[in-house]
Amino acid sequence: MIVIVGAGISGLAAAYTLSRRGEHALVIERGEPFAEQSVGLARIFRIAHQRPELCRLALHAREGWRRWESEFGAGRLLGSEGFISAGAVDAVAAAMREAGAEFRRLDRGEIAAHLPFVDVPWETGIFDPLGGSLRIRRALTALAQRADIRRADVLSVADDGAVALGDGTQLRAERVLICAGVQTPALFGPLDIEFGSHTRFTYQGADATGAACLSAPEGYGLPIGSTGRWAFGQDVADPATVRRLFPTLTPVGQVDCVTARAPWLDAGGDGWALRRRGRVTGFVGANLMKFGPVLGELLADFVLDAG
């Protein structure tokens, strides 16, 4: 038996991939599935990254999202809105070019055409036509329905695969994968990462359906599926900037999100770390949702490799 600690995108994707390979994976979750780093409805998929290897992985992940759409039968999981990186974009353009990914440069007017409710301050940007808004609830619900999930607190995980639960149960696993977000360092050991929080607000007042997803120096934004609403997040909330960017929008909700900081993340905050001790694998990262299908494959490969 393989025990997976954490029912976010990483744990559920790994469990699904392992089950398709004939392995029994038991997912242990202390709360509700997809409730911490995977919380909320709004996630951006993008090919655009600052490292060509991440652009290539995103191209592979896009194929995986389309495959999941076919396998789950839950409707569209990856939207076709496109993605705009605004502001200083030379590093992103260079990485996409090296990866062979399609993109085109935009001027201020072209950015405004994709985001008609934004008072555009950026003179340049790039458009990633393969980017879009992920339908997170559909995807994670479909993964959870296909997983064996047990609600429990994990107290400790030993090198030999012994897992101690809060109710006194002791599990013996051939392999253990810990991908429990903020809880991972406490269960696995130091992974050179710090977790914090930021708030993502939801807005209405203009129909954002079909608008491109956005990453800019001021924050990130995306349409929430077909609801017509727009989500926008910042590392540090700056209401004045938001009012200037979106003068016709009104906040109607918020989601408190987990953010990560680590020296091994790139300048865009993307990346992950994977470590092993004995039979136990520890995994942490940031901006992981878009890579979901690829992470499932990567984590399954790593867990099953005894080397």
Predicted regions, residues:
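C-terminal catalytic lobe of FAD-dependent flavoproteins
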Residues: 248-307
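Short loop/edge segments at beta-strand edges and connector loops
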Residues: 107-108, 150-153, 253-256
